[in-house]
Amino acid sequence: GFSADGAAFDLRGMVRPLLFVPPSMPLGVLLQKMQAERIHMALVIDEYGGTDGLLTIEDLIEQVVGEIEDEHDVDEADSFIREKPGVYLALAKTPLEEFEAEIGRNLTDHDEIDEEEVDTLGGLVFMLAGHVPARGEVIRHPEGPEFEVIDADPRRIKRLRVRLPDVLDQLA
């Protein structure tokens, strides 16, 4: 394959070694093994050869010493921010009740939405869209709010911009 600048692209140069471990391996033993072999990831394999999960050395250390803040972590206290009146930037995992309290309206009180099945903003948008929306896609709520997908991967929504048109119209 090729990279954007036309140079040859070698995926082998990006591959990193990975440990394969059973779910029964004690944390301390796995941590020592990762340190000794200088490998930072382990794939947890079940008895049938299926994948139980992926662990990083950071995951293990956090189990011992507690949460470690790094440049990739988002402050959970700020699961959404008001950019301006009527416009919010929010993590998809923002609890729906918390966001509804902020904007003063119930987003699940509608025929198209099963209130029992939705806990987060991302879940609401997924339910409204009927699929995992792509970055840039705008999903409209039947009651007016618009959800623009700011960040997503093929499996999940990560960040949203929420616009409340009625609030924006009042300001215009």
Give residue ranges: language-model regions.
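Cytosolic regulatory modules rich in charged/polar residues
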Residues: 1-172
